[in-house]
């Protein structure tokens, strides 16, 4: 099974409601693109041990926002925040260890930092920990061990984790094969606009796996997938279009028109939770 690329969510971290004014002022400046002011305000706080400021400076170096991109500096600042239990810093530090950016590549260290963040409920870290088990990075490949972490991330609405669960249930990897469960998880990711899930959901409707065969629904999901693949995924988009056209051979003109209308009217929706 080919799993998607690692998903790294990097976002500037706001302080809580009782935060000191400089944190809020720095965040406001960063949102306006005034990274020099943000860095000037965050730096003394970070030097005093403020984990939020440390994380945000790490992010600026990670992304090259207002400073030259510097993975080594990003690692240093993320580590300061991570050592204080900052979950996003732990997750991003794990990703840098996994990719070998700013530090020598070290899957064991990546696993350690992902786990720290995952145990705090960080959805991206939970997903990445599942990836580590599912691909055998730093640990023996173990789909069964990946499943609980994907479930935790999926329960928080992370579409790529929902998609991976669909794959595992559909293929019977780490869990008994269960087309109904695969359909459920593909559906959750598809409704959020994740194109791989949309294509696979279309395939399940076309094949009648976990549901009665429904070519109208298959056409709809194939069509939506084709629309949402980006330019770097031309082959996947072309495959979705071919799948849609095959489904169309089993449909009446009226059904095709109805399916096309569904595609036009469809809008992605959140499942009500955020990672």
What is the role of each PLM region?
Residues 2-9:
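Sec-dependent signal peptide recognition
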Residues 15-17:
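N-terminal signal peptide c-region/cleavage motif recognized by signal peptidases
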Residues 22-29, 41-45, 56-63, 67, ...:
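Hydrophobic face of amphipathic alpha-helices that form TPR/SEL1-like repeat modules
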Residues 29, 33-34, 47-50, 63-65, ...:
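Short helix-capping/linker turns of helical repeat alpha-solenoids
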Residues 227, 233-275:
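Terminal, low-structured helical/coil segments at or just beyond the last alpha-helical repeat
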């Amino acid at each position: 099974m080919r799993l998607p690329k690692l998903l790294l969510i990097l976002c500037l971290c706001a302080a809580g409601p009782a935060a000191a004014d400089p944190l809020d002022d720095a965040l406001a400046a960063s949102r306006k693109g005034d990274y020099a002011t943000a860095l000037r305000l965050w730096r003394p706080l970070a030097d005093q041990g403020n984990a939020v400021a440390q994380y945000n400076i790490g992010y600026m170096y990670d992304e090259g926002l207002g400073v030259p991109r510097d993975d080594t500096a990003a690692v240093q600042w993320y580590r300061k925040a991570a050592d204080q239990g900052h979950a996003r810093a732990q997750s991003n530090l794990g990703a840098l260890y996994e990719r070998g950016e700013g530090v020598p590549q070290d899957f064991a260290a990546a696993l350690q930092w992902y786990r720290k963040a995952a145990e705090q409920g960080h959805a991206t870290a939970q997903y990445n920990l599942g990836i580590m088990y599912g691909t055998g990075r730093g640990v023996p490949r173990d789909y069964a061990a990946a499943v609980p972490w994907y479930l935790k991330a999926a329960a928080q609405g992370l579409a790529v984790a929902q998609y991976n669960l669909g794959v595992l249930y559909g293929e019977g990897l780490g869990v008994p094969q269960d087309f109904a469960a695969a359909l459920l998880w593909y559906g959750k990711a598809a409704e959020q606009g994740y194109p791989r899930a949309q294509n696979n959901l279309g395939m399940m409707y076309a094949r009648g796996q976990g549901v009665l065969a429904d070519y109208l629904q298959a056409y709809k999901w194939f069509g939506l997938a084709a629309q949402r693949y980006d330019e770097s995924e031309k082959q996947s988009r072309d495959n979705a279009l071919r799948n849609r056209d095959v489904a169309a051979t089993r449909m009446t003109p009226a059904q095709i028109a109805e399916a096309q209308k569904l595609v036009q009217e469809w809008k992605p929706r959140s499942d009500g939770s955020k990672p």
